[in-house]
Amino acid sequence: MSGTVIRSKTLEDAHAHPEMIRSGAFSPAMQAGPFLYVSGCIAGDLSQDMTGQAQQEFSYVELVLQEAGYQLTDVVKLQAFITDAANYAAYSAVRKQYFPQDPPASTAVISGLLIPDALLEIDVVAYKDDK
C-alpha cells in the first residue's frame, strides 16, 4: 500500500526543530488509507525545560494533524521517547492537557535522542473513519 505524503506548510510556525525542517529526509506525516502516521518531532527551542519542549511538540503534532484533516481526538497511538525518567511527570502533565479525556494508547521509552539537548521526541498515529 502506498501512502500520501503530508507536507506541513507551516513547520517553522509549529515549533519544530530547525534540523527537522532543513533535512527533508522524511515526511512530516504519511497518510495510508484512514491512518495518518506523524513522524517523530523534537522541539525547536531546546533551551526550555520538559514542560516547554513537550508543549512545543504537541503543538506541532496538532498542526500537522489539522493540515491533514485530522484532530487530536483522532490520535489512537502515541509514542514518547524521553531522555530522563525524572522528566516523565512533567511530560505526562502536558500530555494530559492535550488529551484530557479518552487518551490514546501510549508507550513511553527512556532513550537517548539524536539532537543534543532534546529532552523528548513524540510521534503519533491517527485514525479517521471518513478518510
Q: Where do the language-model regions lie?
A:
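N-terminal presequence-like segments and the immediate start of the first folded domain
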Residues: 1-76, 82-131
